[in-house]
Amino acid sequence: MAEAIVSVTVQKLGQLLLEEPLFLFGIGDQVKQLQDELKRLNCFLKDADEKQHESERVRNWVAGIREASYDAEDILEAFFLKAESRKQKGMKRVLRRLACILNEAVSLHSVGSEIREITSRLSKIAASMLDFGIKESMGREGLSLSDSLREQRQSFPYVVEHNLVGLEQSLEKLVNDLVSGGEKLRVTSICGMGGLGKTTLAKQIFHHHKVRRHFDRFAWVYVSQDCRRRHVWQDIFLNLSYKDENQRILSLRDEQLGEELHRFLKRNKCLIVLDDIWGKDAWDCLKHVFPHETGSEIILTTRNKEVALYADPRGVLHEPQLLTCEESWELLEKISLSGRENIEPMLVKKMEEIGKQIVVRCGGLPLAITVLGGLLATKSTWNEWQRVCENIKSYVSNGGSSNGSKNMLVADVLCLSYEYLPPHVKQCFLYFAHYPEDYEVHVGTLVSYCIAEGMVMPVKHTEAGTTVEDVGQDYLEELVKRSMVMVGRRDIVTSEVMTCRMHDLMREVCLQKAKQESFVQVIDSRDQDEAEAFISLSTNTSRRISVQLHGGAEEHHIKSLSQVSFRKMKLLRVLDLEGAQIEGGKLPDDVGDLIHLRNLSVRLTNVKELTSSIGNLKLMITLDLFVKGQLYIPNQLWDFPVGKCNPRDLLAMTSLRRLSINLSSQNTDFVVVSSLSKVLKRLRGLTINVPCEPMLPPVDVTQLVSAFTNLCELELFLKLEKLPGEQSFSSDLGALRLWQCGLVDDPFMVLEKLPNLKILQLFEGSFVGSKLCCSKNLENLEEWTVEDGAMMRLVTVELKCCNKLKSVPEGTRFLKNLQEVEIGNRTKAFKDKLISGGEDFYKVQHVPCVVFENCEL
């Protein structure tokens, strides 16, 4: 990873030399020498990074280079911030100005000395590395990182998420057992060591068509070592209930929550998966909501067989076995050679020989095989496969697996997969160390943090319209393809990963590497009490700190935050306090001493006032102020607009991807926004909100909508009455959301001509007509949402030829005036969901007439 850090530092030094020569007056030569030395050392780092696991001496040299790069950035940043601060104070008196000049001269001399000292350190490391035999790389061959990532995205589809080898017979047996259960609660346990495929098997059962038909409701909850009863119960209830119940469920007291969930499970036939439950005590604190007399069933995954037998001694216990050599190669082949049909048979045979040598080192563990398969999928030649094989033999034998245990073996394989990551993707991987076990990470936030810290390198040569956010997404996709992170949710329209999480074994590797690289300090409240954890931060030189509270800590105020001296943590670059309850509702004043801070989040905290010292944070890139109540913003935040925004201000935001804008009903605003289309060529999501006043006429958005030709998502909150013609919409439009539009005419006359529409959401007041006919040309429609109050006058619905639509809308149950639903040309499975006893029958049971036309029998 040092290679990526040095590259960023070299780039920043180059920008300073080019853009700030006056600031560097007197020390420019020293800065240039430092840049040259870093460039030279960067040529050694590829070989050094690969040899770190073999030699502690090499590890120390790499760490020294990394720290020297950080130190150089910190020194120059601090100097420029101090100089800029003096400049802004505008000293007028001659003596004070003279003192300022003398101070700057002293500072320059001091900075120059520190830069020379860093350069000297690096020169000594370079000499030592040469003597040790570290090889110098004169440049990377082949594609650039961004190009290779993009090429792999096209040639390596998301096959990893669906592979199932060695579990086929177990799957069918467990599914049949599950759907043949009686009227008493039964627990099906999948038990085995980490990396054996327990969660993979549970997911296959959870989504099996027989299971989906048998049960009415479904819930999947990650439990993990830190089992918090309220959170688990809430997650189960939220999964099982309708979205309009969410706020009420979240407001329930613990006792009410347990009672209501118990009644719900007794009334309904539900399937609940408790993934990764660790101990008997966790089962004891959760089990009270599960009624004995019920058609519901529970699947739990655990590493502890005692937990499985304790939960239900008479239940179904399944213990997946290690893969055989043949099964191991089958899984590796599926992942590593997927999409390579054009490879010569002789090369495939050679790769198979190497692959079979490689899987022997995996000991039959599916996780290790899957991760290595993802690694080999990035290698296209026999020589590259052979090199991986040699490194595996070396790494596994020397990597600490002397006891031969499977856990140590898989840990070695996962560590090797990290070493093979491209340098900048390594930093993205290590950022997962910030998050607790089994945490579902929002990718947008993760990517924005990596961008803000300079971890995502700008792309010089790439296709038009590609942004730095796209490159960040590519980094994340690379981790997905290598099975180093697991996808939570994908965007239906764009297929981008929206949320993801990390397997706990992979997370252990992530934490280990993050510690080795001094990347982040993780404070875990299970290791020391809360106050000591926070106070310990005051003596640390970390640039990133993750405070992870456990054991109900979320219900208490963080009383020790005021004891932390941020003044001693000046190197900190990210401070994320999301969800914390801070005593007094105010951050300490010495937050302003964190002069290198790039990211500060007080999201969903009780902070009511920002300290005035926040104005000192000149390098701030991301400031998240989405708090629970009102927030006082001090006037130290210069040029921080808190009033209305002029649409013309958007003309400078040429890379904007999503825009939500509130307009008056005046045509001038529409003309201005329409003109933005000439500049906002990368806009993918647009939300337009116009006040719906009774006396005002409907809005004509034809010109505005047709101006943006690349939109993938469009949301309209306005009085419309009639949709624009199909020619007005972007051909890429995949999602359309309508609020308060008052549509009278059937919108499907237009919507059926939009070829890529996948999501249609109709909210309150969006349609006031009496008939909807969805009859043709909507083959790609996958999701259709109808909210309560959306179509109160609707009498008839026709659904035909929407072959990808998974079911009728959830909100169909709100359409009290609905008299007829006609469904045509659909599968038997779709039909079975809607007939009496079917999974979705509750949606249409109030409709007098449900007609199935030309459906499978």
UniProtKB/Swiss-Prot annotation:
GO CC, any one term: plasmodesma
Keyword annotations from UniProtKB, A to Z: ATP-binding, Coiled coil, Leucine-rich repeat, Nucleotide-binding, Plant defense, Repeat
Top-level taxon in the UniProt lineage: Eukaryota
Coiled coil: 27-60
Pfam families named among the record's database cross-references: LRR_14, NB-ARC, Rx_N, WH_DRP
Residue ranges of LRR repeats: 653-678, 680-703, 754-780, 791-816
Domain NB-ARC, first and last residues per copy: 148-461
Binding-site residues, ATP: G192, M193, G194, G195, L196, G197, K198, T199
Biological process per Gene Ontology, one example term: response to other organism
GO molecular function: ADP binding; ATP binding
Function: Potential disease resistance protein.
Domain notes: The LRR repeats probably act as specificity determinant of pathogen recognition.
Family statement: Belongs to the disease resistance NB-LRR family.
Name listed for the protein in its UniProt record: Putative disease resistance protein At1g50180
